[in-house]
Swiss-Prot record:
EC number: 3.1.4.44, 3.1.4.-
Protein's UniProt name: Glycerophosphodiester phosphodiesterase 1
Lumenal side: 24-254
Native species: Bos taurus
Subunit structure: Interacts with PRAF2. Interacts with RGS16.
Taxonomy of the source species: Eukaryota, Metazoa, Chordata, Craniata, Vertebrata
Length: 331
């Protein structure tokens, strides 16, 4: 006989939803009808996660907590470059987190920001620049160790994948948007490099990206990324909007997104991991996700004490800006 708990612990969120609908509609029939319909839709359109054994091969490839170099280790080398990938491998990282974006002519490249201003000697929006134009820029220009990394170029997705595989690094693909273009580009590299199925994971803040990736290829390991209050506040905790009403609206949206991420979207997408901002992770939090068969990966863990806590106490892998020393986080 089917049990709620066997379906990933959905009894809690659907019971809560039913109670809310009962209070709002005052109609048991309508509340039950809506809740039941939503559940059937969820079951119909959700994806099964990849087998846990293969997911663990990606998330803990050495059968222990993994340290993942954020943007290749943005404190130790220019972020999202081949030099950063090589440096991360040299410094003992188990893997690298890399940001996927696109040029004006549709070439998939590594870049975190929507503009090239912060990391290069150029200016302008990435979506307005062709690959030929961005290839002339120096991605090490504004890095603190710029003199140690001459002649760096903004790499293509394919170049980065080949470099990671050459160093036996697990890849965390952080997809910023462009669900259709991103999944198409990723599918091509998975087909060219089948080894990626066992040593990479596709991650995004945007559930539609992960859902589209699972639609495109259900064998790809995936993860949702989440930071509470991300819609209403910046990474350093500042409100995004000056208008009280607009800020309040986005706070409400944050509450809805947070509930959906923790109760519905992980199941809909069939993810294997949940990448959470470190300040909101506790032993109980890790335990609750583990009960659902999902691994928690923390970001961004940048001090020796924090790393020791994750390694020895929580047993959770983490993403860090530096493999060598304490540093302030990059948002």
């Amino acid at each position: 006989m089917w049990l709620w708990e066997e379906q990933g612990g959905l009894m809690g969120p659907f019971s809560f939803l039913l109670l809310v609908l009962l209070l709002l509609t005052r109609s048991p029939f309508n509340a039950c009808l809506f809740t039941g319909s939503l559940y059937l839709l969820l079951r119909l359109f959700s994806f099964e996660p990849v087998p846990s054994r293969r997911a663990m091969q990606v998330l803990k490839p050495r059968d222990r907590v993994s340290a993942i170099a954020h943007r290749g280790g943005s404190h130790d080398a220019p972020e999202n470059t081949l030099a950063a990938i090589r440096q991360a491998a040299k410094n003992g990282a188990a893997g690298v987190e890399l940001d996927l974006e696109f040029t004006a002519d549709g070439i998939p490249v590594l870049m975190h920001d929507s503009t090239v201003d912060r990391t290069t000697d150029g200016t302008g929006r990435l979506c307005d620049l062709t690959f030929e134009q961005i290839r002339k820029l120096n991605p090490a220009a504004n890095h603190r160790l710029r003199n140690d990394f001459p002649n760096e170029k903004i790499p293509t997705l394919r170049e980065a994948v080949a470099e990671c595989l050459n160093h036996n690094l697990t890849i965390f693909f952080d997809v910023k948007g462009h669900a259709y273009k991103a999944t198409d580009a990723l599918k091509k590299v998975y087909m060219e490099f089948p080894k990626l199925y066992n040593n990479s994971i596709v991650c995004s803040f945007l559930p539609e990206v992960i859902y589209k990736m699972r639609q495109t290829d259900q064998n790809v390991v995936t993860a949702l990324i989440h930071r509470p209050w991300s819609l209403s506040h910046t990474g350093d905790g500042k409100p995004r909007f000056e208008s009280f009403w607009k800020q309040s609206m986005f706070v409400a949206l944050d509450i809805l997104l947070d509930w959906s991420m923790h109760n519905i979207l992980w199941y809909l997408c069939g993810v294997s991991a949940f990448l959470a901002q470190k300040d909101f992770i506790s032993p109980d939090y890790v335990k609750k996700w583990s009960a659902k068969g999902i691994q928690v990966v923390a970001w961004t863990v940048n001090t020796f004490d924090e790393k020791s806590y994750y390694e020895s106490h929580l047993g959770s892998s983490y993403i860090t800006d530096s493999m060598l020393e304490d540093c302030t986080p990059e948002f």
